[in-house]
Amino acid sequence: MKLKVGVQLFSVMTELANDYLKTLENVAKAGYKYVEYVDVPGNSPEEIGNKVKELGLTAIASHVHFDPFTSTQEDMVKIVEDNVKMHSEAIILPMGIMTTMEEIKTVAAACNEMAALAKAHGMAFYYHNHCQEFYQVEGKTAYEWLVELTDPELVFFEVDTFWATRGGQKAVELIKKLGSRAKLIHQKDMGKSADPINLIEGVTDLTRENYCEKIFGRTNPTDICTVGTGIMDIPEIVKTVTELDYAPYIIVELDSCARQTEEEYNTPLSPLASIKASREYLESVIG
């Protein structure tokens, strides 16, 4: 199965906040047919869903405001119902902060519950990693515990290869280990400024209160760059995902990147130009 290139709309967050529907048009003009939602206040689910259909886009999934520690059953039902109206194929928990076994169990239980609800409405459920999940808790990483404690028939994983790398993992090995549960791939590229690459190494006494300072406080916007202009071995990732044949999409996500050009590091592209260049690069690698 040939990989399809999608885009996480967080990559154009400022544009979305200014005019969500116009930005969808511009994303389509940038050559994208597959999009992944990010939750932005403003337009109704119906308006967004109708626009996506009008443009002939496929809504791969949606990163949602779902907190495993505070979201109620009512909150979860609304999330699912809104995403049905948006024609989303899946719901994704963008990140979880788990630094103790009790917290891991809470996140796992919430994922199982949301996944069952999503399935009942014809949608899949995924967990998207950053790097803090690769902190060790009782002999394993929190991520390993999450994989073990979630229902393999309901909970799948969107592997963010950049953040996995910054968690001290080899992205291709993580994808291989997850096997058929790794059904979506997030791809950005790593700038030369990323130092240290492994943000977890040496971190101790991590908590839900201090994780942002201890981990993300050591990052820089230029750590993330346009796909194909950084130091990640993206052809190896594409080759691995293609050979395994579990994930139909590789999704560009550029976070708050400086979007450097290959020719002149630190010269930013606009977000729309950057996602276009990223798509073109990935499609050239996929062939």
Go through the PLM ranges and name each one:
Residues E25, Y34, P41, P68-F157, ...:
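Active-site acidic/histidine proton-transfer and metal-coordination neighborhood
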Residues M1-A28, K53, D82, H87, ...:
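Histidine-acidic metal/acid-base catalytic patches
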